[in-house]
């Protein structure tokens, strides 16, 4: 079975087998993150069939867009390595290192999303951007609140297992792909990220009247970079407010009391 899978990858993009392995892993992790967060907030999430279908389908396209964007550096590296070097020992270990690093970051992102959701019932947003800006204070609070180093150790070990599985079942080292085909593969690969960058909007995740389902239809990393780019936060969602009429009445009463 392993050889048949590798033969398939060898014939169809074997040089980029590390990319396909990481993309598959990333999509699987995002699926289970979405499912896990939905179950965590089961009392607030709508579990109607049509809403769930929309949530997972729309979420899949957000996940795919993020995964393909994230793989661009590895795709470029795999494309430029000459054929005579591709099967060398140093390149094998370098690619395995890329896979391990990618798997570690994917798992770290999943764990971070859980803790962020636990506190804010939301995917990453502008609050997460502030966390990145005020890194020193945030890291201190995180170290005091969570077992950071044990978590990092577990993530590293799990990433090593994932790397071993991808290496054993998917990675192909002997490929005969000339530079023209490599350039064509790169252009095809980045086509979807380019289309999604200009054609997708974070508003596409608004699939229902339920705020939780809308958040779950999105993708944490997509929302993080969207918040960083747009520099905005839904004030009415994250801060307690009064109806405009009630707030105006209170303000008028205070002005009259002070003689204003």
Please state what every model-predicted region is.
Residues 2-234:
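Transmembrane and membrane-interface helices of multi-pass
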Residues 220-260:
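Membrane/wall-proximal cationic-aromatic binding patches
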């Amino acid at each position: 079975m392993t050889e048949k899978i590798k033969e398939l990858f060898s014939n169809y993009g074997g040089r980029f087998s590390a990319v396909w392995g990481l993309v598959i892993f990333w999509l699987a992790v995002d699926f289970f993150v979405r499912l896990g967060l939905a179950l965590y907030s089961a009392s607030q999430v709508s579990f109607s069939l049509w809403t769930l279908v929309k949530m997972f389908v729309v979420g899949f396209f957000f996940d795919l867009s993020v995964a393909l964007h994230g793989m661009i550096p590895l795709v470029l590296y795999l494309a430029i390595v000459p054929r005579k070097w591709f099967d060398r020992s140093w390149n094998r270990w370098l690619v395995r290192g890329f896979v391990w690093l990618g798997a570690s970051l994917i798992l770290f992102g999943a764990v971070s999303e859980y803790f962020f959701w636990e506190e804010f019932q939301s995917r990453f947003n502008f609050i997460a951007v502030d966390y990145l800006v005020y890194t020193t204070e945030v890291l201190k609070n995180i170290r005091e609140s969570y077992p950071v180093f044990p978590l990092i150790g577990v993530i590293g070990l799990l990433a090593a297992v994932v790397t071993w599985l991808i290496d054993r079942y998917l990675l192909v080292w002997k490929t005969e792909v000339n530079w023209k085909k490599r350039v064509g593969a790169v252009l095809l690969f980045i086509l979807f990220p380019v289309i999604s960058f200009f054609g997708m909007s974070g508003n596409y995740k608004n699939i229902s009247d339920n705020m939780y389902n809308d958040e779950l239809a999105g993708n944490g990393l997509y929302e993080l970079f969207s918040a960083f780019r747009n520099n905005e936060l839904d004030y009415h969602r994250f801060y307690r407010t009064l109806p405009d009429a009630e707030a105006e009445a209170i303000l008028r009463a205070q002005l009259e009391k002070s003689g204003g």
